[in-house]
Amino acid sequence: MINLGAKQSTIVVAMSGGVDSSAVAAMLNEQGHNVIGITLQLYDHGMAVGKKNACCAGQDIYDAKMVANKLGIPHYVLDYESKFKESVIDNFVDSYLQGETPLPCVQCNKSVKFRDLIKTARELGADKLATGHYVRKINGDNGAELHTGLDPAKDQSYFLFTTTKEQLEYLRFPLGGLTKGETRKLASKFGLEVADKPDSQDICFIPDGNYKSVINKIRPNSSESGKIIHVNGFELGEHSGIINYTIGQRRGLGIAYNEPLYVVKIDPKDNIVYVGPESALNVQEFIIRDVNWLADEIKDNEKLEVAVKIRSTRPPRLAEISKLGDDKMKVKFLCKEKAVAPGQACVIYAGARVLGGGWITREIR
């Protein structure tokens, strides 16, 4: 059993209604801590897609309340819909309109789930905020460090790179050393009905996967057609709006050519989608912005060999990083990588430790 310390603490648990956060609440409650469950109502799905029972709404809120009742802990539902729309949904929509491939789960963790929820937890007098994320917090020589979860199949460190050092000191991740199977066994041991509840797979505010309908409802007339141009300079056809395309896309281009073509660049200013052969996707280096750095400071002229992830589903790749001012870095792969997409995150690792990360810009070569 994972113990967060012998001293009884007041701990807020972010309860989503799923098995992970429910198991965390049960574990901490059994250890004798004063546990307070908080569930965030983030989105009225009927506003955009007419779906119910998706993450952080409907059935999930009910499930979280039932778990809290079984454990005998206080439970509160906080209406964060306006915060969520401003910080996550609007950012998601605007990112697509800028020709990027957004990552809303990171934005949600950065703003609503950590910044705003930590503030609420402190106002409640809590000593810590615990979540069901599969990452580890390890106390190093210079303070708290963020490390990958021990189960590589469930590791969520990529989505938490924006966590600040100050936030990391306050946060607890009791599941970081467990597998999903072990978590489900714990939930069963505690008699929680959510023990076998399936994991949510979709973006919470787009449960049917149709992100275009959300964009069009929030930003009407955003799918303006434009040119599809080959990277060699000649026009191949017309696209149906840049929101329908992402870097590396091959299917659904609606053009015929004598070899397979991929989306290699999106120009939102001139409303152009550039396509080319697979080799045109190869990238040697790129710039990241809004860097959140969790390790020792890098000197201005220093180059550091690290591993980086540019998609949550891709393995880390060896690279060299260097500072460009206060909040930018240059990332140079040791071997070229395909389909580096603006708007996605680049997370930087040294072994299992998360050193930091930033957002991929259009400055790609």
UniProtKB/Swiss-Prot annotation:
Residue numbers binding ATP: 14-21, 40, 132
Main location as per UniProt: cytoplasm
Active site residues of this protein: 108 (nucleophile), 204 (cysteine persulfide intermediate)
Single Gene Ontology MF annotation: ATP binding
Region entry Interaction with tRNA, spans: 154-156
Keywords assigned by UniProt, alphabetized: ATP-binding, Cytoplasm, Disulfide bond, Nucleotide-binding, RNA-binding, Transferase, tRNA processing, tRNA-binding
Subcellular location: Cytoplasm
EC number(s) per entry: 2.8.1.13
Entry's Gene Ontology BP terms: tRNA wobble position uridine thiolation
Cysteines joined through disulfide linkages: 108-204
Interaction with tRNA, annotated site positions: 133, 344
Record field: catalytic activity: S-sulfanyl-L-cysteinyl-[protein] + uridine(34) in tRNA + AH2 + ATP = 2-thiouridine(34) in tRNA + L-cysteinyl-[protein] + A + AMP + diphosphate + H(+)
EC class of the enzyme, as a word: transferase
Listed NCBIfam families: PRK00143.1, trmU
Family per similarity comment: Belongs to the MnmA/TRMU family.
Protein name (database record): tRNA-specific 2-thiouridylase MnmA
Organism: Rickettsia rickettsii (strain Sheila Smith)
Gene behind the chain: mnmA
